[in-house]
Amino acid sequence: MTEQRKHKVITLMGPTASGKTALAIELVKNYDCEIISVDSALIYQQMDVGSAKPDAAELAVAPHHLIDIIDPADSYSAADFRKDALLKIEDIISRGKTPLLVGGTMMYFKALIEGLSPLPGANDEIRAQIAVEAQANGWQALHDQLKEVDPVAAARIHPNDPQRLARALEVFRISGKSLTELTKVKSEAFPYEAIQFAIAPNDRKVLHKAIETRFKAMLGLGFVEEVKKLKSRDDLHLELPSMRCVGYRQCWQHLDGEYDYETMVEKAIVATRQLAKRQLTWLRGWPDLIWLESGAENNLDTVLRYSR
């Protein structure tokens, strides 16, 4: 373990549409590193356009680990990511290269670097039962249940946040212990030295414009057709984490007739901007970050200087 701590990994975090992938590819060209994706949308197969997955030309230059690894109908947790990422890091280091972790899923970064509590895995039967209860009695009734067994979590989780509410109840029903109690115990610390960068524009308007431009480009690349194909499957629905990804949810609802095309475009752009705002909030509270300005000419030199 002491020897492992000498090894460095580079992390490149940032909000959506901030230029992470472009900078990461330049790093691969100029530094002996391999990219590990830290993105909860890129893990899914058949979700290429709307997730801004690197294209074939980009992947030929800079292959990405941990993209296209699961079906959209399957579940994948932060604990799954931590396990998979640690294995990839070990493999890359064993081949004499530097791992470069790139993405905007801050929950994954937090799980990897700070460790995770030993929570039980998903239980399909219990999840189904919770869904039945929610359908019959409403999420407020389930929130009242959570107040009884885990008042601390109930105070933190809103009744209109079904994913987190269901998970807190699921943990209690599986383990007999509250989420609050279990999260006091952390898994083993991150065994590497992390050199951590964050990239974002200084002007929020620049990021907002980049988000709008990128989403409209996705529409030109066939995003609606991609969602139509996913929607034609009988095992996908809006309650799945994959279909709750920003853009996919709004497009699905448009195809369901909930609103017209123009409204879908507007809602998807607004939702993406809200995601970027949450990502930036996380990053501002993240320690030991070296900040980079999106599009700055010296970004590559800065990363190389700190990483060597």
Curated annotation (Swiss-Prot):
GO terms for biological process: tRNA modification. The keyword Zinc-finger does not apply. Transmembrane segments: none annotated. Keywords: ATP-binding, Magnesium, Nucleotide-binding, Transferase, tRNA processing. Pfam families: IPPT. ATP binds at residues 14-21. Its cofactor is Mg(2+). It catalyses: adenosine(37) in tRNA + dimethylallyl diphosphate = N(6)-dimethylallyladenosine(37) in tRNA + diphosphate. GO terms for molecular function: ATP binding; tRNA dimethylallyltransferase activity. Gene3D superfamilies: 1.10.20.140, P-loop containing nucleotide triphosphate hydrolases. Residues 39-42, 163-167, 244-249 are annotated as: Interaction with substrate tRNA. Belongs to the IPP transferase family. PANTHER family: TRNA DIMETHYLALLYLTRANSFERASE. Catalyzes the transfer of a dimethylallyl group onto the adenine at position 37 in tRNAs that read codons beginning with uridine, leading to the formation of N6-(dimethylallyl)adenosine (i(6)A). This is tRNA dimethylallyltransferase. It comes from Shewanella piezotolerans (strain WP3 / JCM 13877). The gene is miaA.
